[in-house]
């Protein structure tokens, strides 16, 4: 009986160790994906603000060249 009990504990232990390792890897991958998403959102916001700024600058230049008439 004691032998079966020890064997059962060993099997459960050997099953739980890989399970916990998989959980750690999964959480690391999710964190990496979240960081990549955050970085892409920052880049998108930067590009949008640059385009808006360039549009305002060009609009001001064309407005002053044409004498403010469209």
Curated annotation (Swiss-Prot):
The keyword Aminoacyl-tRNA synthetase appears for this protein: no
Propeptide: 23-44
Localization per record: Secreted; Target cell membrane
Protein keywords: Amphibian defense peptide, Antibiotic, Antimicrobial, Cleavage on pair of basic residues, Cytolysis, Hemolysis, Immunity, Innate immunity, Membrane, Secreted, Signal, Target cell membrane, Target membrane
Skewed-composition ranges (Acidic residues): 29-40
Subunit and interaction comment: Monomer.
Family statement drawn from the similarity comment of this UniProt entry: Belongs to the frog skin active peptide (FSAP) family. Plasticin subfamily.
Function: The native peptide is a cationic amphipathic alpha-helical antimicrobial peptide with potent activity against both Gram-positive and Gram-negative bacteria. It has weak activity against fungi and shows low hemolytic activity. Acts in a synergistic effect in combination with Phylloseptin-B1 or Dermaseptin-B2 at doses that are not active alone. In membrane-mimetic environment, it adopts well-defined helices that lie parallel to the micelle surface. A short amidated analog (AA 45-67), shows potent activity against Gram-positive, Gram-negative bacteria, and fungi.
Protein name: Plasticin-B1
Source organism (scientific name): Phyllomedusa bicolor
């Amino acid at each position: 009986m004691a032998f079966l009990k020890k064997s059962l504990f060993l099997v459960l232990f050997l099953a739980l160790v890989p399970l916990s390792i998989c959980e750690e890897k999964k959480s690391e991958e999710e964190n990496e994906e979240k960081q990549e998403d955050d970085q892409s959102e920052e880049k998108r916001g930067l590009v949008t603000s640059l385009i808006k700024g360039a549009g305002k600058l060009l609009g001001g230049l064309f407005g002053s060249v044409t004498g403010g008439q469209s």
